[in-house]
Regions:
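Nucleic-acid endonuclease domains
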Residues: 1-160
Length: 160
């Protein structure tokens, strides 16, 4: 029930503070993630929070970092994700197929490997550090190092 404890009267109706806070949050997301499908942002934030809380509570990691990386690519670059387990790439950005690889907080090095046979023209590498802060870098396939054993191996520091 809306009333003076959780809302204010404006133009003949009650307006809840929750509605105002949601609108403010929506605007802040727009400023932080201008390319995002904003409906994905709360899912991304909740999933990241659950992963961090689980790690803080148990000392173990959930197997969700790939999904977190893909969602981060969707909200930071506007990558349109394919259905789960689609072969060759994780999504599209305009006319480019994008493969997303995630460096997890527990990984001992900052390398990712991607199959040379994959159907992608851009590689997005998302790094989640031990404090669960994210950053990402994108590289064109033509700028990847030469493949060895059917895989490209890319160091985070080598991506411009």
């Amino acid at each position: 029930m809306l009333g003076p404890d959780n809302a204010f009267w404006d133009d003949g109706e009650w307006v809840s503070w929750n509605d105002i806070n949601r609108q403010i949050q929506y605007k802040e997301w727009g400023a932080k993630y201008p390319n995002a499908d904003r409906s994905l942002i709360p899912i991304f934030e909740d999933l990241l929070s659950v992963a961090e809380d689980y790690h803080d509570t148990t000392g173990s990691h959930l197997q969700v970092y790939g999904d977190i990386g893909e969602l981060f690519g969707a909200i930071t670059y506007g990558v349109k994700l394919h259905r789960n387990y689609a072969q060759g790439s994780d999504g599209r950005l305009g006319d480019d197929f994008v493969e997303v690889k995630t460096i997890t907080p527990f990984k001992s090095n900052d390398y990712v490997e991607v199959k040379a046979s994959g159907n992608f023209s851009k590689l997005l590498v998302v790094k989640i550090n031990q404090h669960f802060e994210l950053s990402c870098r994108m590289i064109s396939r033509k700028n990847l190092p030469k493949a060895k054993g059917g895989k490209h191996r890319i160091n985070w520091l080598e991506i411009a």
